Amino acid sequence: MSGQESRTLGAWGEALAAAWIRKQGGRIIAANFRCRFGEIDLICEEKGYLCFTEVKLRKSTAYGSAGAFVDFRKQNKLRATAQYYLSRHSTTFQPRFDVIEVYAPYGLETKFPKITRIENAF
């Protein structure tokens, strides 16, 4: 898969995750928030939480779950990016780190991708 195809598939997965969050009653505050520390795919408010969400799309679980790809190094980058965000955006919501797994065996051709959320993932 080329870099462009991978980015397209990733953006599609993030759009699916955002729609899923909205369907669950959440409100998207920011998408693809970037700073010098890293990037957070989705930031949303939901049930008293400010959720910093990493979206992982995989075609299969052959090499492990999608959530398993959020390793310690990535977690540290997400924490630093979230701290930066919170230093510039005050909130009364409790911060939380989630991972949304999107499984799409046929890539963009998948009609019913499986979406799951790991709340308080780390």
State each model region's role.
Residues 36-38:
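Short acidic/glycine-enriched loop/turn segments that link adjacent beta-strands
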Residues 31-34, 103:
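Short, solvent-exposed loop/turn elements at beta->coil junctions and helix N-caps
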Residues 1-31:
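Acidic-basic catalytic patches of nuclease active cores, encompassing PD-(D/E)XK
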Residues 42-61, 78:
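Conserved catalytic cores of phosphodiester-cleaving nucleases, focusing on short active-site segments
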Residues 88-122:
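Domain-level recognition of nuclease-like catalytic cores that cleave nucleotide substrates
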Residues 21, 78, 97:
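Residue-level signal for inorganic ion chemistry
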Residues 27, 50, 94:
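Hydrophobic "anchor" residues on beta-strands that sit immediately upstream
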Residues 59-87:
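Mg2+/Mn2+-dependent nuclease catalytic core
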